A protein has these predicted regions:
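Acidic/polar low-complexity segments and flexible, solvent-exposed patches
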Residues: 1-103
Length: 103
């Protein structure tokens, strides 16, 4: 499968930099990212087997790469902080093992 950059994951009640995320904050986060990356899309973590966390709204970029390292290099080139972008592979079968690689 192809690797894509995961650039955000938020769930209800999550607190980041003093902001408590509800639906409006999750959507605002997505819209901000989509303005910078028009190919960004959002999925619910429960709909895919590669995510270990449940109830997350995950923003990914529809720019695919053959390897996790290539994906993470894209994250570096875009200037993302290490924890804000990493390689992910969307899967409907299997589990999280081997389907994400942090930087």
């Amino acid at each position: 499968g192809q690797w894509v950059p995961q650039i955000s994951s938020k769930r209800l009640g999550l607190v980041v930099d003093g902001v408590t995320f509800g639906y409006p904050e999750i959507m605002a986060d997505f819209q901000t990212l989509k303005a910078r990356y028009p190919q960004a899309f959002m999925v619910k973590s429960d709909d895919y087997t590669n995510f270990s966390g449940k109830d997350f709204w995950v923003t990914l970029v529809a720019t695919s790469f053959g390897t996790a390292d290539e994906t993470n290099a894209w994250c570096d080139q875009q200037g993302f902080a290490e924890q804000d972008c990493y390689a992910s592979r969307l899967m409907h079968t299997g589990g999280p093992a081997g389907n994400s690689k942090t930087r």
